[in-house]
């Protein structure tokens, strides 16, 4: 997780350096608001930053970032191989998905814990929680279409404001 305000180093250059050394490591940019992102002189690409999140004062955004990365990395294996369900979120605003994801993850964990039997062992509870629905985030029509095709049998819901880019046009 990279902050915008790093002394003597812009976050894009820092993210690019990390990606050169560790190409598969996710790099997340955490900004205080959209104006910080607009002040960055270089265009943000996947070669430097995987996703931008906005800090709104709620520490649960960190848990959401970690779960988002876990779901992104494990989605294919868990959904296809283990028949785990998924929720597709189509949202192009970092501020919006930074607020929605913590809420969704909290609710999913709450519901899974509610369904758990009280007499399960700790290892069984952990296994049960790992089987929670995965959350798939995309920011545009093409990404949503790709994910729907790939996981169509396992998508249990789609959350969207129905206002997102298609062919880079909003």
Explain the meaning of each model-derived region.
Residues 1-27, 31-42, 49, 61, ...:
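Conserved phosphotransfer microenvironments
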Residues 1, 42-134, 141-142, 149, ...:
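Non-catalytic signal-transmission and effector/linker regions of two-component phosphorelay proteins
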């Amino acid at each position: 997780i990279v902050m915008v305000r790093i002394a003597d180093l812009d976050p894009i250059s820092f993210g690019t350096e990390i990606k050169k050394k560790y190409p598969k490591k996710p790099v997340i940019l955490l900004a205080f608001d959209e104006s910080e992102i607009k002040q960055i002189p270089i265009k943000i690409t996947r070669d430097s930053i995987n996703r931008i999140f906005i800090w709104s004062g709620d520490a649960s955004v960190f848990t959401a970032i970690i779960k988002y990365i876990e779901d992104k990395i494990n989605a294919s294996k868990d959904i296809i191989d283990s028949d785990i369900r998924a929720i597709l979120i189509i949202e192009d605003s970092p501020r919006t998905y930074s607020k929605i994801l913590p809420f969704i993850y909290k609710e999913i964990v709450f519901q899974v814990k509610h369904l758990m039997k009280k007499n399960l062992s700790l290892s069984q509870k952990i296994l049960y929680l790992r089987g929670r629905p995965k959350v798939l985030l995309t920011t545009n029509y093409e990404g949503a279409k790709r994910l729907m095709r790939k996981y169509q049998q396992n998508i249990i819901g789609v959350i969207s404001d129905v206002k997102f880019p298609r062919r880079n046009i909003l």
